[in-house]
């Protein structure tokens, strides 16, 4: 998934992060109710959010070029 994030612009990454956060919240609610098809999806989404946060922070600090 990281390779696909490298081609995103900063605005695209922030939008994708917001989308993943909403999807993660949905999965959390579904897991409480007990209707989750793939319980490992929650972990994958959480890790993708962390990857995006890292890349966004690198752009803001100037470590990674736009």
UniProtKB/Swiss-Prot annotation:
Species this chain originates from: Borrelia garinii subsp. bavariensis (strain ATCC BAA-2496 / DSM 23469 / PBi)
UniProt KW keywords: Ribonucleoprotein, Ribosomal protein
HAMAP family: Ribosomal_uL29
UniProt lineage: Bacteria, Pseudomonadati, Spirochaetota, Spirochaetia, Spirochaetales
Annotated GO CC locations: ribonucleoprotein complex; ribosome
InterPro entries: Ribosomal_uL29 (IPR001854), Ribosomal_uL29_sf (IPR036049)
GO BP, one annotated term: translation
Pfam family, one: Ribosomal_L29
NCBIfam families: L29
CDD domains: Ribosomal_L29_HIP
Segments crossing the lipid bilayer: none
GO-annotated molecular function: structural constituent of ribosome
Protein name per Swiss-Prot or TrEMBL: Large ribosomal subunit protein uL29
Family according to the record: Belongs to the universal ribosomal protein uL29 family.
